[in-house]
UniProtKB/Swiss-Prot annotation:
A Gene Ontology molecular function term of the record: magnesium ion binding
Family of this protein: Belongs to the RuBisCO large chain family. Type I subfamily.
Annotated positions of the Phosphoserine modification: 208
Designated name of the protein: Ribulose bisphosphate carboxylase large chain
Catalytic residues as annotated in Swiss-Prot or TrEMBL: 175 (proton acceptor), 294 (proton acceptor)
Name of the gene: rbcL
Main location: plastid
Catalytic activity: 2 (2R)-3-phosphoglycerate + 2 H(+) = D-ribulose 1,5-bisphosphate + CO2 + H2O; D-ribulose 1,5-bisphosphate + O2 = 2-phosphoglycolate + (2R)-3-phosphoglycerate + 2 H(+)
InterPro entries noted in UniProt: RuBisCO (IPR033966), RuBisCo_large_chain_AS (IPR020878), RuBisCO_lsu_C (IPR000685), RuBisCO_lsu_C_sf (IPR036376), RuBisCO_lsu_fd_N (IPR017443), RuBisCO_lsu_N_sf (IPR036422), RuBisCO_lsuI (IPR020888)
Cofactor detail note: Binds 1 Mg(2+) ion per subunit.
UniProt xrefs under Pfam families: RuBisCO_large, RuBisCO_large_N
Amino acid sequence: MSPQTETKANVGFKAGVKEYKLTYYTPEYETKDTDILAAFRVTPQPGVPPEEAGAAVAAESSTGTWTTVWTDGLTSLDRYKGRCYHIEPVPGEETQFIAYVAYPLDLFEEGSVTNMFTSIVGNVFGFKALAALRLEDLRIPPAYTKTFQGPPHGIQVERDKLNKYGRPLLGCTIKPKLGLSAKNYGRAVYECLRGGLDFTKDDENVNSQPFMRWRDRFLFCAEAIYKSQAETGEIKGHYLNATAGTCEEMIKRAVFARELGVPIVMHDYLTGGFTANTSLAHYCRDNGLLLHIHRAMHAVIDRQKNHGMHFRVLAKALRLSGGDHVHAGTVVGKLEGDRESTLGFVDLLRDDYVEKDRSRGIFFTQDWVSLPGVLPVASGGIHVWHMPALTEIFGDDSVLQFGGGTLGHPWGNAPGAVANRVALEACVQARNEGRDLAIEGNTIIREACKWSPELAAACEVWKEIRFNFPTVDTLDTQE
């Protein structure tokens, strides 16, 4: 008998295909504190039992493949395999269920969101035995969290850098998002910052196009920042989008921003990729730059309820990879966002310890072990009438960003910024006096209009604007 044949015989190798559930469905398994836990919404093909589908997810996202291989005998599968340890039905959905999978920590490279996602949401999402698959939530264990730097600075450090406390921060995305020259772009930035905003922002697809190259934009925006700071006595910033075609070019743009002395840069973390994002976050921490994160492309991944990945997972991944701000929906604006679900992942972005709460879509208790928090950014179709609701929903540790709601003011950009600042200050003062923003919000705004003609004009323009469409990605009703 040859040595190779002898090895196969000794490990009891038997060629062929066997059911996944014989190896990867282990309902008796007790999860460990070091396991990464995942909750998948699974829709199996007709005829595929839930246990087999759940086990297939565990197998194909860890050590398994479609057939038995003799090299299984050269390692300890019990140590390295993913395990489907629990299955539960989805209320109101006969063909869907939640499969809970535990992954040993040794399966993942330290400090790499890229590697974690390559395994957990890799090829398994194209598996033919599944009609659809969605990753609803992840529990990141402290042992793995501690291998990440996380956000470059975090909420408290940002407030200290900006010297701004006790209220949400105010921003504005410059519009039109494409087509302005660098000088006209810088003019709009100056007018908004001079009017009372804390930040202005490059839109996600502003990189370095023929009509406005990145270096020119950076220079004119820096001039606008310094001029508005000198005139207002407040620290100002503009999210300079450093996203580029290569990591090297991205870092070059961040270096130039640092040389200009501006406080913050920006990255499109999903289109740019997690490897690029983590690299930029490390640079920002080392060089004192805040990092604003845009989530362009997220709805391709997270909007459909039965396939893809919920944004709460992308939010957790961003906190690991690094970012000081991230767009998180508005609940009340033009973009998708269920209220309870949004509040759930907002807490996961900001808080150090978040308890399991299925009523808000949180499947696992998450301990961030002092990883810095991320400011959620509310942006998309919001205006001054939304200010009470936004202040009540998101609280002080947030960024409220009005693009069209600033630049669409009938009197111009600076009056639009004034209107938003007055509305915010009125809401914060009313809240601090004990008034209920959810009930008295419109009254508070009308009262402020009496001493702010800019706010009164904005209220008149947008009094009829509504985005009353049902949310596609709603929470399941728990029995």
